[in-house]
Amino acid sequence: DGLSDLLFTAGTMANSILSKEGAELQNTYMVGNIIIDTLRHNYSRFSRPTLLDDKKIKDGDYYVLTVNRKALLSDEAYLLSMLTTLNNSVNGKYIIAPLRGVAKEKISNMCQRMTNILVVDSMGYLEFGYLTSHAKGIITDSGNIAEEATFNNIPCITLNDYTEHIETITKGTNLLFGYYVEKIEMALGY
């Protein structure tokens, strides 16, 4: 940021951080948040995934799980412990995990006997947007998905000990859990 002549931000929190870092605010422009702008623009176009009807799952009666970070996927002992805890903590509700690639392969293998976790193919934007905006809660390692959850007022657990999206924490919709499996179990009991 210190090397740039012009700075473009997504909100007042980013402006505040830049100000604290000594940026010249006359060269800082708040242009909006493209993630949220895209969400707003497409909300009426969201498409209910057929999986929900096939499994007779009602809106607000399931969780969504996304996992993509290599560090999380490479720690197989933690990953298995986390998945087992999730499976045992959702009171019979489904956890829908739209995954791809290595994440899908690893988690599918680990979840073969876990009846509450449904590992499915990754979804397009409109289906995934519907899925996350109608979930009971979201478990993710993605800051962008946590940000969308905050916009949709959906409770979110972030499987990390930091986030670039501080507003998700200050609004109260997102909890940072890092690698603490026991916290996940407590949070899903809400």
Predicted regions and their residues:
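Nucleotide-activated sugar donor-binding and catalytic core shared by glycosyltransferases
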Residues: D1-K93, V102-Y190
